[in-house]
Structure formats: C-alpha cells, structure tokens
Amino acid sequence: MDHSLNSLNNFDFLARSFARMHAEGRPVDILAVTGNMDEEHRTWFCARYAWYCQQMMQARELELEH
C-alpha cells in the first residue's frame, strides 16, 4: 500500500464522505466504490468507511436523545 500521507488523506476523505452519504440515507454501493482498488487498499478503505459509519450513527442517536 502506498502510505504517502496525501494518498491516505484522500482515501480517508472519501471513506468519510461516503459514510456521511450513507448516514443521510443516500444509497452507497461500496463494492462499486472499491471495485478498482487492490485488496490492501480495499480492506483499509472498508475499515475506515465502517468506522465512520459507526461514528455518524452514534452521533445521530445522541442527537435524537436530546
């Protein structure tokens, strides 16, 4: 995996953006998003996407409680 800071920041930004779309109820086809990635990038990206989805859902639940 290319561990350059710029590359990781770009992938992280994309994972966060797609997680936000998912949290807003917009359809996200994560297989289409990661289709051209090699296995290492896909694994890293999907882990970050899942983490951001979890964070955004927790934030939404907290908002609904108050």
Curated annotation (Swiss-Prot):
One of its GO terms (biological process) is negative regulation of single-species biofilm formation on inanimate substrate. Induction: Expression is dependent on RpoS. InterPro entries: GlgS, GlgS_sf. Pfam families: GlgS. It comes from the Bacteria. Disruption phenotype: Deletion mutants show increased flagella and fimbriae production, are hypermotile, and exhibit increased biofilm formation. Disulfide bonds: none annotated. Belongs to the GlgS family. Major determinant of cell surface composition. Negatively regulates motility, adhesion and synthesis of biofilm exopolysaccharides. This is Surface composition regulator.
